[in-house]
């Protein structure tokens, strides 16, 4: 059965699109037929992070409006087998997204036997975000360990619980997960960031992953590659752990404690 997962956040700049790309890529690496959809109409950043911006011919809105078939709009990833991207439109109005149109596209993807449909939602509560949430079976709420980000995530959780198709039909609610990004144990220790425990206590949803602050993320993004492809990076490893947990595997959380310096590093102040 196809799992529809929305990756969402209360505010921008928390690494939501990076997370969507990494999770989709990781699932495909595990042999799952996966498509990631960009719901951010007008901005379209997912194709840049996935390195396929020059291959966009048709987009999500073209399919909704009947200007293209789903097979024409889907972009097959060149680096990862089983992975497809459905880009957003850069030029169309956000109101071009409709409930019936999104449902039509999702049903077509389900009929194509995708294992996972990852919906990369815009931040906040605009049309794209509401529609990405509405049809989801599961939601990954992406947040930084900062008070403002966590507060906005709490608002998104309210929307997830009340504005979904599942809540309308009074069936099993959307399964919610917390993804904590840009986590820096040193800053947590100094009191400059909330701890993982603090965020869990505030939001009260299960945590699926903790992604450390890592310069490799920006480098990968600029190269048009998903960070999960860089397994030598801490962030890439943490995203892979997250994917494994999403598939039901148990993995200890890494990168949540300050790295202990060796004697020589302490001696030379490095």
Swiss-Prot record:
<dbReference type="InterPro" id="IPR010223">
    <property type="entry name" value="MinD"/>
</dbReference>
<dbReference type="Pfam" id="PF13614">
    <property type="entry name" value="AAA_31"/>
</dbReference>
<keyword id="KW-1003">Cell membrane</keyword>
<comment type="function">
    <text>ATPase required for the correct placement of the division site. Cell division inhibitors MinC and MinD act in concert to form an inhibitor capable of blocking formation of the polar Z ring septums. Rapidly oscillates between the poles of the cell to destabilize FtsZ filaments that have formed before they mature into polar Z rings.</text>
</comment>
<keyword id="KW-0132">Cell division</keyword>
<comment type="subunit">
    <text>Interacts with MinC and FtsZ.</text>
</comment>
<comment type="similarity">
    <text>Belongs to the ParA family. MinD subfamily.</text>
</comment>
<dbReference type="GO" id="GO:0016887">
    <property type="term" value="F:ATP hydrolysis activity"/>
</dbReference>
<dbReference type="InterPro" id="IPR050625">
    <property type="entry name" value="ParA/MinD_ATPase"/>
</dbReference>
<keyword id="KW-0067">ATP-binding</keyword>
<dbReference type="InterPro" id="IPR027417">
    <property type="entry name" value="P-loop_NTPase"/>
</dbReference>
<dbReference type="GO" id="GO:0051782">
    <property type="term" value="P:negative regulation of cell division"/>
</dbReference>
<dbReference type="GO" id="GO:0005829">
    <property type="term" value="C:cytosol"/>
</dbReference>
<dbReference type="GO" id="GO:0009898">
    <property type="term" value="C:cytoplasmic side of plasma membrane"/>
</dbReference>
<keyword id="KW-0547">Nucleotide-binding</keyword>
<dbReference type="GO" id="GO:0000917">
    <property type="term" value="P:division septum assembly"/>
</dbReference>
<dbReference type="InterPro" id="IPR025501">
    <property type="entry name" value="MinD_FleN"/>
</dbReference>
<keyword id="KW-0717">Septation</keyword>
<dbReference type="InterPro" id="IPR025669">
    <property type="entry name" value="AAA_dom"/>
</dbReference>
<keyword id="KW-0472">Membrane</keyword>
<dbReference type="GO" id="GO:0005524">
    <property type="term" value="F:ATP binding"/>
</dbReference>
<keyword id="KW-0131">Cell cycle</keyword>
<protein>
    <recommendedName>
        <fullName>Septum site-determining protein MinD</fullName>
    </recommendedName>
</protein>
<feature type="binding site">
    <location>
        <begin position="11"/>
        <end position="18"/>
    </location>
    <ligand>
        <name>ATP</name>
    </ligand>
</feature>
